[in-house]
Every structure is written in C-alpha cells, then in structure tokens.
C-alpha cells in the first residue's frame, strides 16, 4: 500500500518491494556495450521478462531506476503488458527520449527522482549517482542505476 506524504515522498508498508535499473529492453547495442550474454535483443527481452516474473508477483512494488526500454509505444506497451508488479519509474537518460504519454500512465508514477520509506528506512532514488542529495548526511540511503 502506498500513501502519499508530500509531493515526492511515498511510504510503503506490507508489500514486497524490489529495486532494479537499466533493463534496456529493445536496446540491441547494450548487448555488446555491457557484454550481456544474449544472442540478440529478443533473447535478452524474453530472459529479462521471464526472470522478472519469476520473482515479482502482481501485487509487488518495483522501483525501476531508469533506462527501462528503447523504442516507441509499441515496444514499451508490449513489455509493460508482460511484467508483473506495480512499477514506479525513475526516468533515466534513455527514458527521457522514449517515454510517451500514451504508456507513461501504465506506471504507478514516473519522476526524475523519488524519496521513499521502506520499513522505516529512508531511501533516495535517482538514475544517476549524486554526491549531494537530500539526506546525504543523514540516515538516508541512495539507490541509483546508470553506471552499469
């Protein structure tokens, strides 16, 4: 369950919460760039979807920390229709070019950054790591993607 505390503060209680980033669905160049051991983009997409759904149930919460998918609405919708969970997307550099209003609504929330609390632990979410972030000098964790 999610209760909105302020504009970008959310508190989650009672659900399984997962964090991931940089899936790069439909990004064929990422296979070579990051030395992903897949034959092609279809093999990569199918493996990522299968692994995701083996762990995440429909009621679980997933924070995706950016670079979700390449392509247009057909590709994004095709992937989103197959993934379990309630997905919150922190926009990554590739998402900024590819996110469209038509399927942005398929996410629980899309934002450049999020402040959340899980089991009384404050967590700051962003796609890129930041040296100075809200809570950097307190007991707030920072989770990020981007650096592969």
Regions found by a protein language model. Give the residues of each.
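Core catalytic region of metal-dependent phosphoesterases/phosphodiesterases
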Residues: 9-20, 25-115
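A short acidic-Thr-Gly-centered motif at the start of a beta-strand
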Residues: 7-12, 132-136
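Short, Lys/Arg-enriched N-terminal segments with co-localized hydrophobic residues
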Residues: 1-7
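Conserved beta-sheet core of the metallophosphoesterase superfamily
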Residues: 104-148
């Amino acid at each position: 369950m999610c209760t909105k505390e302020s504009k970008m503060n959310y508190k989650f209680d009672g659900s399984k919460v997962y964090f991931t980033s940089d899936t790069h669905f439909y990004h064929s160049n990422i296979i070579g760039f990051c030395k992903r051991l897949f034959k092609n983009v279809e093999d990569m997409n199918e493996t990522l979807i299968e692994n995701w759904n083996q762990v995440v149930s429909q009621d679980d919460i997933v924070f995706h920390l950016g670079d979700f998918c390449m392509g247009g609405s057909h590709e994004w919708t095709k992937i989103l229709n197959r993934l379990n969970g309630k997905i919150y997307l922190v926009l990554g550099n590739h998402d900024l070019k590819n996110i469209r209003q038509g399927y942005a609504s398929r996410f629980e929330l899309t934002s450049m950054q999020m402040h959340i609390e899980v089991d009384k632990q404050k967590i700051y979410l962003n796609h890129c790591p930041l040296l100075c972030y809200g809570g950097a000098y307190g007991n707030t964790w920072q989770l990020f993607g981007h650096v592969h």
